[in-house]
Each structure stands twice: as structure tokens, then as C-alpha cells.
Regions:
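Positively charged n-region of N-terminal signal peptides that target proteins for export
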Residues: 1-7
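A structural boundary/capping signal
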Residues: 22-402
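Bacterial N-terminal signal peptides
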Residues: 7-15
Length: 402
């Protein structure tokens, strides 16, 4: 088991020191696990910069000036060294900042102070972040050039700033509650934030649980024991709805991959490509219960492939993402993602088209329906209700382009 120890010294007034990994525990050391890595830092609560006044631009400016006089650069340096060593995507790096801020200023103790610490650490890590306040709420935004849905954003100087903490409030009526931006200039905070997740943490073997997944393929039962990590749910709890290009390329973690993909490949041995894709289509269709996001989560939630394996239910978008991932990993065939007004499905390009073909840019793709329907649809069969419906090709995967 590989555990990297990251020593953070957060003595915000008395000074900061970075010690070698795996130092002896001592009084005042705080230790927490960050998805398989042990993070340790020294922190004296008496050195914390307080924020007890009302929400105002003046009080936030005072907080910024006070914390800027502390030896925060060593803290940020260690955070960035972690980023350089482990190469987490921005979303994972933000989770590290959240956990570090929680150790300094617990969220339940003082939400405003906790949010300001997150904003400060993210800004000093080079990201273009900003704040907006109403009479009693504080919103934390980060600049992003990507298409992000279902959460608020602000525009400033032609740039989009996406809210990072909207989930903490549930919902806000922005017509009734007015927010004012607190635009504090932070030097070198110019980097745009990316919501793309291209890798998951290494985790530790002990973090995984084994889940039995089964389905029936033409009168034969197939059983899988898949290793899954519940922490993946935590990583994506507040993850927003992103565009399909980002969403469909979120990978499996290594343990989950190694417990599922080789087993699928073994079962596919001896099948031709068409039958193999049919097998993967039916695995995705019948190994999981169907439930709409609004019923399961109360809102739209696009799940990553590993989340679909973790949860007991999923909708058409979730299954499309899992099926896409499996076909990509095992056969690496060209695919297009079709978005209908109330449905999402996948079409695969075979050597020769099968059944109902979708023509896109001169190529013919065969529809493969990974979501259970009233009829037992074969490869190349489109839902009858969709034959006259308009659709949009929202993502194109061409192996030659990767």
C-alpha cells in the first residue's frame, strides 16, 4: 500500500516549516487521509485569522489583509508541490483545498470563515477566484472557460465565473436576493479552472468493497465481483453537470478497472465485434435498475461510469456513459452520442452498418440502446418513438483523433 505523507505547516502567524515525510507524531499535528495520501500539518487554532463580523466588502478586505500578512506562501507552496507530484485534476485539487480549509476553520463552526479560507487558498494557488455577498450569504466563484450547467455563474469582463459552493445553500432566488461581487485583486491569480476529470486517485486497496453484479445474456447468467470505492461518490457529490465531451471521458479507478474489464474481455473471447458490443450493451442495460435522476437525487446528475457501478439505479445518460466507456476500452470503435429531447443513446461505427444507421459526416453509425425499454432492442434498432424525433450529435469519438 502506497501512502504519500504530505507535511503541511499551517502556523499562520508564528511561521511555517515543511518537514520530511513520515515524521514522528507530535503535539499539535493534524492528520487526515486524502484519497490514499496521508496529509499532516501543524496548526495552532490560536493563530487562525478570525471572521466574526457581518458580511461586507470591508470586512472581507480586512480578512484578506490580515491573512496576507501571515506566512501563507509556504502553505501554498506545499499544496502546489502536492499538485506537481500527484497531478490531480483541478476538481481533485479543489477537494484537497476543501479538506485543508476544514482543518484550519471547520465549516460547521464558522461557514463564512471556512469559505474565505477556501477562496484564499485557491486564489493563492493561482486560480482566478472571486466572491459575491448578499446580506447573509457568501458565494465563492472560480473562472472557467468550460460549459457548466445547473449551477449559477457570473460574467465579468467577458469571463465566466462558476459558483463552487451553491450546493451549501440548496437554492437561491437571485431575483429576490441581490448579490454584490467582492472583487479583491490577488496577484498571479489568473488561471482558469477546469472541471475535466481525466484520472481518479490511487486510493488504497482497503478502501474498496466488493459488489456482486450480474445479468442474463441469452439464457446464460454472468456474475461479476467488482471492486468499488464509496469515496468516488464523495468526489462527485457536488460535481456539476458538464458537457458530454468531459463527462464521457471520466475513467474508472484502477482497482475497479482491473476487477471488471479483464472479466468482460474473458467473456467476450471468441465473439465477433458485433456480438461483443451486443454483450456490453445488454450488460449495461440489464445489470442495473432504472431510475430518473429527479426521483433518485431530486435534480439532474450525470454519473461517471464508476458511479453507475456504485449506485443501485441509473438513467439513460448514465448508462450511455458506461456503455461508451466499455466499448472504448475494449473495442475502441468510433462512436457518436445522440441527444434526443428526452433521451440519450449511443451509435457505434462497425465495419458494416447494422440495422438502423445514423449518418454523420459521411459515416454510418448503428444505434446501440444501453437503457432498458419495453421492447428487447437489438443492435441497430432505434426506439420506435424516436424514429421521427429530432436529435443532436453532442459528442463524437474518433479513435484516430486520440
Amino acid at each position: 500500500m502506497k501512502i504519500a505523507a504530505l507535511i503541511l505547516s499551517l502556523a499562520l502567524i508564528t511561521g511555517v516549516s515543511v518537514q520530511p515525510a513520515f515524521t514522528q507524531n507530535h503535539e499539535g499535528a493534524v492528520r487526515f487521509n486524502f484519497y490514499g495520501d496521508t496529509v499532516v500539518f501543524d496548526f495552532d487554532p490560536a493563530t487562525r485569522v478570525e471572521f466574526d463580523g457581518p458580511l461586507s466588502a470591508e470586512n472581507i478586505q480586512s480578512f484578506y489583509e490580515a491573512i496576507s500578512k501571515t506566512d501563507y506562501k509556504a502553505i501554498v507552496s506545499v499544496l502546489l508541490k502536492y499538485k506537481e507530484q500527484h497531478k490531480p485534476d483541478d476538481w481533485l485539487f479543489y477537494q484537497l483545498i476543501r479538506k485543508a480549509a476544514q482543518q484550519i476553520s471547520p465549516k460547521a463552526e464558522n461557514y463564512g470563515r471556512y469559505t474565505l479560507y477556501k477562496w484564499f487558498l485557491l486564489s493563492k494557488s493561482g486560480y482566478d477566484a472571486t466572491l459575491a455577498i448578499s446580506n447573509h450569504r457568501i458565494l465563492f466563484y472560480v473562472q472557467s472557460d468550460e460549459n457548466i450547467y445547473n449551477i449559477p455563474f457570473r460574467m465579468r469582463d467577458g469571463k465566466q465565473y462558476v459558483c463552487l459552493n451553491y450546493h451549501d445553500y440548496g437554492s437561491i432566488d437571485f431575483d429576490k436576493e441581490k448579490f454584490t461581487e467582492v472583487a479583491i485583486k490577488t496577484p498571479d491569480a489568473q488561471k482558469a479552472f477546469s472541471y475535466k476529470v481525466t484520472s481518479l486517485p490511487g486510493f488504497t486497496t482497503a478502501d474498496y468493497e466488493e459488489k456482486d453484479i450480474s445479468f442474463n445474456y441469452y439464457q446464460t447468467d454472468y456474475h461479476f465481483k467488482v471492486k468499488l470505492n464509496p469515496q468516488v461518490k464523495t468526489i462527485f457529490t457536488n460535481y456539476p453537470v458538464v458537457d458530454y465531451a468531459s463527462y464521457f471521458n471520466i475513467p474508472l479507478s484502477k482497482e475497479t478497472y482491473s476487477s471488471l474489464i479483464p472479466s468482460l474481455k474473458k467473456n467476450l473471447k471468441g465473439m465477433n465485434t458485433k456480438n461483443g458490443v451486443d454483450y456490453l450493451m445488454r450488460f449495461t442495460r440489464y445489470a442495473f435498475l432504472f431510475e430518473k435522476d429527479t426521483d433518485a437525487f431530486g435534480k439532474e446528475k450525470r454519473m461517471s461510469p464508476e458511479e453507475t457501478l456504485l449506485y443501485g439505479q441509473s438513467d439513460c445518460e448514465d448508462r450511455a456513459a458506461l456503455f461508451f466507456y466499455l466499448v472504448k476500452e475494449i473495442y475502441n470503435l468510433p462512436m457518436i452520442v445522440l441527444a434526443y429531447p428526452k433521451h440519450v443513446t449511443i451509435a457505434v461505427k462497425f465495419d458494416k452498418p447494422i440495422g438502423h444507421a445514423i449518418v454523420y459526416n459521411g459515416s454510418k453509425y448503428s444505434v446501440c440502446e444501453p437503457t432498458p425499454q419495453r421492447d428487447d432492442l437489438q443492435v441497430g434498432q432505434l426506439l420506435p418513438d424516436l424514429k421521427k424525433s429530432s436529435y443532436e450529435v453532442v459528442y463524437v469519438y474518433n479513435p484516430q483523433a486520440y
